[in-house]
A protein has these predicted regions:
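Mixed-charge, Lys/Arg-rich low-complexity intrinsically disordered regions
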Residues: 2-52
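Compositionally biased amphipathic helical and low-complexity segments enriched in hydrophobic
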Residues: 10, 37, 54, 75, ...
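Compositionally biased, intrinsically disordered low-complexity regions
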Residues: 16, 42, 51, 57, ...
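A residue-identity detector for tryptophan
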Residues: 20-21, 56, 122
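Intrinsically disordered, low-complexity, charged/polar segments
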Residues: 90-169
Length: 169
């Protein structure tokens, strides 16, 4: 079964415009975040070097001004009881593109395919302050959908962010 990413990639051979991808994704009737996770290649733990989409129920949600229950993250490093991840949903779409472009020099190769991994030094990147979050394994509610480098330009525009109690923008 082809994933939503496969369908878009198949119809966009040779076209790299982020605006074109964004319009294509918005024109589609995309399944919800949970459906994407269920239909894609999912793992029980986050896969480092690629993006991951998963369901999450924050431990201190009652104290947060807003939070995302379906984060789209780059997991960076293990942390007590979980991991640190960069959630792209905390950035406006234009900033997501700029952030993704800024990561181009951190790739393991220039193929931008299933073999490509990102090596991010999150302590010195402009976009990190707003997006770095500590995720606890015992608050993860779904498997982790692994999103490869070739799917990332599409994934940042999928309307799967689910903020509760407000929005970061």
């Amino acid at each position: 079964m082809a994933t939503v990413f496969d369908k878009i990639l198949d119809s966009t051979t040779g076209r790299k415009s982020y605006d074109w991808y964004r319009k294509k994704v918005q024109a589609m009737t995309t399944p919800g975040a949970r459906a994407l996770i269920n239909q894609g290649k999912a793992t029980l733990r986050p896969k480092y070097g690629v993006k991951n989409l998963f369901g999450y129920d924050p431990k201190h949600k009652d104290k947060l001004p807003y939070y995302d229950v379906f984060p789209l993250i780059f997991p960076l490093e293990p942390a007590r009881g979980g991991f640190i991840g960069l959630n792209f949903h905390y950035l406006k779409p234009g900033a997501r593109v700029a952030f993704l472009r800024s990561l181009a020099n951190t790739t393991s190769n220039k193929k931008y395919d299933k073999t490509t991994r990102y090596r991010i030094n999150w302590r010195n990147n402009l976009y990190m302050r707003k997006t770095a979050k500590h995720y606890l394994f015992n608050h993860v509610r779904t498997s982790f959908l692994n999103i490869t480098a070739e799917e990332m330009a599409i994934a940042i525009f999928l309307p799967v962010a689910r903020f509760k109690k407000g929005s970061p923008y």
